[in-house]
Each structure stands twice: as structure tokens, then as C-alpha cells.
């Protein structure tokens, strides 16, 4: 029975979540030795992962939103330990979990403890890893939030313009992207670099992405000067934004932007004028549904 042992690292704000408590108790009643630890401040996720591994745990559970899942996934991948991860999505967007088919109810999510773990990729940039997606654009107020007005205009692609509170704030700048067999340069509005498929609560920016193919999906929204001025009218007239994207699938891509690029890395901000994004194949073992849409690249 020693293998029926796991440790849940739970975001502190979820400590009083009765659904989580009931799911944990149900697992314990089924014979699992399931311990719980709470995060309180920055750095706790990494510390708790290290403590869990030192104590001999080989199954960890990440309970929280996309940022918490990223922190725990990164810490576990960096530890290079023979341990696997179960995702307990408790955020508002839960983008990676939704795309992967992970149940959003705690009891059903914990059922994945009984499903064999599969190796999946992570993305890496500037020494930081991401589980789901990096989105970026130009603007001084890039955050994880997106204007409701902008969502109405741009639909799913609005999340690319994270934090731009008014359409008038959209700005294009020159960027250059280069990877194996791929070179693109020009004025761009925004981009998405996905290990997963969606961001912003269900918007598929990288619709064909697989989490186990050793590649990152790149989606670029170009901004020729004539398009920047008329984008709102084009979209309001019924032109779908998806066919405006330039897409690629690469093991790595280097981005150069003279004005600097604001990146949202699974909720974490990052900025730079030269950034290299790399796929880390098989960096993490995760218990996903056997029919997960994100699996298939390594089959």
C-alpha cells in the first residue's frame, strides 16, 4: 500500500474549500495516505516540492490556479526526481487543465491518481518554465487581465493583448522570430507560444498544440500598418481573426523586438528585447486522462 501515497500542495486561499476537503477525505477512506500542505507566500511551492521529494513522495498534487500549477510543475521538473504530478485545477481560467481534459471537480480530478503518468513537455524562457502558454505584446500595462470591451471586438484573440484597457492602446512594433527552418519578421501586434492550446479562459490561440510532441506552437498576429488602422472594422464586419495568424511548430524560437516585448508566462510577467523560447521534451510526468486531447505527439 506504500504506493498509494501522495502529497497535495494547495494554494492557501483554497484551505477552506469544502469540495477539496471532501475529495481528500474520500481518497483517504479509499486507502490513500494523502497529506496536505498549504502555500502562503512566494517561494512556498518550490520549498514544499523539495520537502516532499526529500520525504520520499513520488506522487504530488498541485491544487490551485494556472500560476500555482506552473510553479509546482517548474519546481518538480527542476528537481529531476522520479515523481509525477496530478493537476487539481482550482483557478478561474484553468486553461491547461481544460485543454487536457482534466476534470474540474476535485473528486474527479483526484481520480487521476489511479491513471498512469505520461511524460509531457514544458516550455522554457529566460530560465523560467511554463506549463501552458506564453502570450505577449507591446504595451506598458501588460498583465493577466483583458478588457471586456476588447474581448467583444476581438473575441478569443483578445487574450493576446493582455492588459490593454482600450483598443486605442494597441500598438505594433517590429519583431523578428527565428527557429529551425522558420524566419519571420515584420510589424506584429501580439503572439502566443503554446505547450497547451488555450489561454484567457478557453480561447484557443494554439489550436493544434500537443503537450508531448517536443515542440512549441507559435501563433503570430502580424500588424501591417494598413491592418492596424482597420482591424476593428474588419473584425466587426465578420472577418474571423484566426486566418490572420502566422503559425509554426518549432523546438525553439528566438524573438527579437527592439522596443522590448511584454510576456505573460502562465500569469508571470517577463520582459525583454531578445527572448529564446525552448521546448523541454518529456520534462514532467503528469497523470492526464488517457484520451487527453493534448497527448498524442509521442505515440
Curated annotation (Swiss-Prot):
Cellular localisation: Cytoplasm
Keywords: ATP-binding, Cytoplasm, Kinase, Lipid biosynthesis, Lipid metabolism, Magnesium, Metal-binding, Nucleotide-binding, Phospholipid biosynthesis, Phospholipid metabolism, Transferase
EC top class, as a word: transferase
Family annotation (SMART domains): DAGKc
NCBIfam families, per the entry: lip_kinase_YegS, PRK13054.1, YegS/Rv2252/BmrU family lipid kinase
Lineage of source species: Bacteria, Pseudomonadati, Pseudomonadota, Gammaproteobacteria, Pseudomonadales
Cofactor (UniProt): Mg(2+); Ca(2+)
Protein name according to UniProt: Probable lipid kinase YegS-like
Active-site residue list: 268
Main function: Probably phosphorylates lipids; the in vivo substrate is unknown.
Secretion signal span: none
GO CC terms of this entry: cytoplasm; plasma membrane
Family the UniProt entry places it in: Belongs to the diacylglycerol/lipid kinase family. YegS lipid kinase subfamily.
Entry binding sites for ATP: 39, 65-71, 92
Gene Ontology molecular-function annotations: ATP binding; lipid kinase activity; magnesium ion binding
E.C. number: 2.7.1.-
Positions contributing to Mg(2+) binding: 210, 213, 215
GO process annotations (BP): phospholipid biosynthetic process
Free-text cofactor note: Binds 1 Mg(2+) ion per subunit. Ca(2+) may be able to substitute.
Domain spans labelled DAGKc: 1-129
Amino acid at each position: 500500500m506504500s504506493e498509494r501515497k501522495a502529497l497535495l500542495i494547495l494554494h492557501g486561499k483554497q484551505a477552506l474549500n469544502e469540495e477539496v476537503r471532501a475529495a481528500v477525505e474520500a481518497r483517504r477512506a479509499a486507502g490513500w495516505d494523502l497529506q496536505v500542505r498549504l502555500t502562503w507566500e512566494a517561494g512556498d511551492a518550490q520549498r514544499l516540492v523539495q520537502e516532499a521529494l526529500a520525504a520520499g513522495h513520488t506522487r504530488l498534487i498541485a491544487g490551485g490556479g494556472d500560476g500555482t500549477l506552473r510553479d509546482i510543475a517548474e519546481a518538480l521538473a527542476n528537481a529531476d526526481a522520479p515523481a509525477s504530478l496530478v493537476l487539481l485545477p482550482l483557478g478561474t481560467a484553468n486553461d491547461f487543465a481544460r485543454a487536457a481534459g482534466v476534470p474540474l471537480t476535485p473528486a474527479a480530478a483526484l481520480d487521476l491518481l489511479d491513471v498512469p503518468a505520461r511524460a509531457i513537455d514544458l516550455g522554457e524562457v529566460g530560465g523560467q518554465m511554463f506549463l501552458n502558454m506564453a502570450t505577449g505584446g507591446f504595451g506598458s500595462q501588460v498583465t493577466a487581465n483583458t478588457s471586456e470591451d476588447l474581448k467583444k471586438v476581438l473575441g478569443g484573440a483578445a487574450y493576446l493583448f493582455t492588459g490593454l484597457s482600450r483598443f486605442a492602446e494597441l500598438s505594433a512594433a517590429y519583431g523578428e522570430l527565428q527557429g529551425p527552418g522558420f524566419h519571420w519578421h515584420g510589424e506584429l501586434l501580439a503572439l502566443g507560444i503554446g505547450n497547451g492550446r488555450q489561454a484567457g479562459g478557453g480561447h484557443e490561440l494554439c489550436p493544434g498544440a500537443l503537450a508531448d510532441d517536443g515542440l512549441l506552437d507559435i501563433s503570430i498576429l502580424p500588424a501591417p500598418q494598413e491592418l492596424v488602422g482597420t482591424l476593428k472594422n474588419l473584425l466587426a464586419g465578420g472577418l474571423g481573426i484566426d486566418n490572420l495568424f502566422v503559425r509554426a511548430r518549432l523546438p525553439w524560437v528566438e524573438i527579437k523586438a527592439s522596443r522590448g516585448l511584454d510576456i505573460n508566462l502562465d500569469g508571470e510577467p517577463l520582459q525583454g528585447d531578445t527572448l529564446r523560447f525552448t521546448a523541454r521534451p518529456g520534462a514532467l510526468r503528469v497523470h492526464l486522462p488517457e484520451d487527453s486531447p493534448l497527448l498524442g505527439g509521442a505515440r
